[in-house]
Amino acid sequence: MFQGILLVIDGKIKKITENENPLYENGIDLKGKYVVPGFIDAHIHGAYGADAMDGTVEALKTISSFVVKHGTTNFLATTLTSTKEILKNVLEKIAEVQNKELEGANIFGAHMEGPYFDIQYKGAQNEKYMKPAGIEEIKEYLNIKPGLVKLFSLSPKDDAALEAIKFLKENGVIVSVGHSAVYFDDVQKAIKAGLSHSTHTYNGMRGFTHREPGVVGAVLSSDAVMAEVIFDKIHVHPEAVRLMLKAKGVDKVECITDAMSATGLPDGNYKLGELDVYVKDNQARLVSNDALAGSVLTLDKAFKNVIELGYSIFDAVKMTSTNAAKEFGLNTGEIAEGKDADLVVLNNDYSVDMTFVRGKLKYQA
């Protein structure tokens, strides 16, 4: 951490000067504030009344405009388990706006959450669309636009799933374990096949016991796996987050929101895909069985929660930005010369004051 000047030209960090030189012409004086890399959310379904599964460009733009107010500069629009036809339509809409300048955060691709899951750990996914993995179907998703699908969550429950993992990895897609009833040894086989990510770790997966470490044990013990966590203090107890960080280190944990359409809106009744959800006391739950149904979290809150747990601002930056940037090969996530100028200006209480995407001011409090 230092005081100095950031020179941004054509959307990139051109020069960093570590001193108190006078401001450049058209400069912004941020004295007394923090400047950190923009947050990256690899798992978000919706916000402010919009859901990626709405299948419209307008919905995606609404999510983009909302999350930028909370410091997110890049995100993966995330799908839900559904029919092949609906999923292809949603992916086509995401493809239209992928890496195109929007009023808010950049959408750098799609995260397909499903449909190859286990009903036992369905969470808020619709079980009627769950099915075994199939490479021919996956090809249809990937053929919509090369490089669109960046992350694919599935359960590595059989040989078909293992073949799908190999195929996805060969095609540049990161594969994640999620909504899965498999055992420790099954995840180990999946890691050997190319799996390297864990979807909202602890949630929607076989838990840890001393006789069967489960999916959780496999994720915590593997250096090859990047672990997502919904750090809203609701989905995961703070001490379980600390345990994860002790097991994996701050370089292998990513804060995600798993936010749904009610994020940013008052308590009330909403939809998550086709399922009815109610929101109360910062919790989104299914009307049918009271199960947690995504979150109403924003990454600025997750950033604060990391610091409140006793970790440094540097660790919080890694978990909300740098780790995801490295995992997905993005030219951002660090304040360094040559990097994209995706930046968040924070006040002393870590609230968002300004957000810059590719050097352009997209939000100011």
Enumerate the predicted regions with their spans.
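His/Asp/Glu-enriched, well-ordered alpha-helical/loop segment
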Residues: 217-229, 233, 245-257, 263-346
